[in-house]
Amino acid sequence: MHYRRLGHSGLFVSELCLGTMTFGGSDDMWGHIGKLQQEEADGLLKTALDAGINFIDTANIYATGKSEEILGHALKNLGVPREDVVIATKVHGPMGEGPNARGSSRGHILDQAKASLKRLQLDHIDLYQIHGFDPATPIEETLEALDTLVRQGLVRYLGLSNWAAWQIVKAVGITQARHLAPIVSLQAYYTLAGRDLEREVVPALLSEGVGLMVWSPLAGGFLSGKYDREGTTAEGRRVTFDFPPIDKDRAYDAIEVMRNIAAEKGCTVPQVALAWLLHQRVVSSVIVGAKRVDQLTDNIGATEIQLSEEDLTALDAVTKLPEEYPGWMIERQGEYRAHLMQER
């Protein structure tokens, strides 16, 4: 297992992060994702820790708090030293019926941070992330609330999730202008089956020194090796929960190339998908969730896969985004003086 800086911070995290969205679901949306209870969660966490994973991600909304509770108990059950793990959680989603029981207002953030700490049985959160953009709350209010948590010692680092490029850059600018605790990470959807992030968000992250944590790297299981143009196995998650949306024809093209690469390297299709992400400069960590230990073990094997330039070119040929304005115009006009930068 290798460790990478989270953005431009001094925090180093494992290149794979254990996702816990499969913890604690019942007969609702979360149950379609996973219903792991304590003993199963303990087993997954132990497997992750034994492999060198030090980064674990959850959210207050996952199974309406149950995921955090199970993770907290798992850390205790395994006797994990606090300094050995980086615990990330998120706030934004609805945790009650009222209008103030959701979103990114100061009150909701401060209340939910304390609630998450209680469920996790911790005295601080290593990375606290705003789970989505709240159009009803000024960005300044959100960032001031996060800064308060850092100054109180309840939170160490701050991140965002599912924000647009302009929102991220604006937030970074506000923290700099007001001398607030900085934004060090973005958690976002990025995969060979969906590279939309590359248009605006990836350049913004590289420009501002914000690290990328990837969620759903296998496109909701579509790149798990269970799917092809001939159909799917009955255990595929998308049979009951078809999310995130993808262009399936393009994804099938990618799967065909991935199968060839996997056959040549003696690895699996999901390992190729994860390895491709680990070859992307913007990525700090890739979040991998699982329902079984063998799935997690297979994902961990991706850290040993080296893709050649030929492999990367073949994958790019079937998954790259079509050119759109203003991207193609920026590239064209940038050529006027690009050679001057190359000569330095």
Q: What does each of the following model-derived ranges do?
A:
Residues 1-85, 151:
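N-terminal binding-site loop/beta-alpha segment at the start of enzyme catalytic domains
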Residues 6, 18, 41, 56, ...:
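Conserved, mostly hydrophobic/aromatic
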Residues 1-2, 42, 231-264, 279-283, ...:
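Terminal-tail/helix-coil boundary detector
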Residues 197-235, 268:
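Aromatic-lined glycan-binding groove of carbohydrate-active enzymes
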Residues 45, 68, 72-75, 113-117, ...:
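Generic structural signal for well-ordered alpha-helices
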Residues 27-28, 33, 94-196, 200:
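Glycine/proline-rich, positively charged
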Residues 13-17, 54-55, 84-88, 124-127, ...:
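Structural preference for beta-strand elements that scaffold enzyme active sites
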